[in-house]
């Protein structure tokens, strides 16, 4: 655990987290623009949650040896991964239990101070159906993979948070 504590205090750990998020975001854009799979509202919200983890990685990169900055990164990571997991589970439910009484919104809704779909519609505009399964890999749908990814992030975060209490004396 001391090794993980030390690893969380160097920029490499936060940079690796950021690289993973860049990979996932690039994958999402590849699905959208190269494979022509239309993103739905939940896909866009899950994309924003993933970017939140990227933001947490950037916070940690600033000065991971500083206790306050490192914990701000952990908190942002946890909030973003938790929100992403909630969204992905809801998205899986839309796909596996389609119902006319339980559907996702028709349009993305962002705050007026951050209308991401207006600023970058190529990345944040949704025009797909949340309940439609458009892609599978190893029998899992995209939202099911996102459940694994966000849950994996929460597990990794928990391990790093626990490691914070194992200091060299």
From Swiss-Prot:
Superkingdom as given in the UniProt entry: Bacteria
S-S bonds: 40-43, 104-130
Keyword Cell membrane: yes
One GO location term (cellular component): plasma membrane
Keyword terms, alphabetized: Cell inner membrane, Cell membrane, Chaperone, Disulfide bond, Electron transport, Membrane, Oxidoreductase, Redox-active center, Transmembrane, Transmembrane helix, Transport
Gene Ontology MF, one: protein-disulfide reductase activity
Periplasmic side: 31-48, 90-144
Cell membrane keyword on record: yes
A GO BP entry: protein folding
Membrane topology label: Multi-pass membrane protein
Topology feature Cytoplasmic, residues: 1-13, 65-71, 164-169
Residues that span the membrane, as ranges: 14-30, 49-64, 72-89, 145-163
Function, in words: Required for disulfide bond formation in some periplasmic proteins. Acts by oxidizing the DsbA protein.
HAMAP family in UniProt: DsbB
Family per similarity comment: Belongs to the DsbB family.
NCBIfam families the UniProt entry points to: PRK01749.1 (NF002485)
Name this protein carries in UniProt: Disulfide bond formation protein B
Organism: Aliivibrio fischeri (strain ATCC 700601 / ES114)
Lineage: Bacteria, Pseudomonadati, Pseudomonadota, Gammaproteobacteria, Vibrionales
């Amino acid at each position: 655990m001391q090794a993980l504590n030390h690893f969380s205090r160097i920029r490499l750990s936060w940079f690796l987290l950021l690289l993973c998020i860049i990979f996932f975001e690039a994958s999402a854009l590849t699905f959208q623009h190269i494979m022509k799979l239309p993103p739905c509202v939940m896909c866009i919200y899950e994309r924003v949650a993933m970017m939140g983890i990227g933001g947490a990685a950037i916070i940690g990169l600033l000065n991971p040896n500083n206790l306050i900055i490192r914990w701000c990164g952990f908190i942002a990571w946890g909030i973003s991964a938790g929100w992403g997991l909630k969204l992905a589970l809801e998205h899986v439910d839309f796909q596996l239990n389609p119902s006319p009484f339980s559907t996702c919104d028709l349009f993305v809704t962002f705050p007026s101070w951050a209308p991401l779909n207006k600023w970058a519609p190529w990345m944040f505009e949704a025009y797909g159906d949340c309940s439609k399964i458009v892609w599978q890999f190893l029998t899992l749908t995209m939202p099911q993979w996102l459940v694994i990814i966000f849950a994996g992030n929460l597990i990794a975060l928990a391990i790093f948070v626990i490691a914070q209490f194992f200091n060299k004396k």
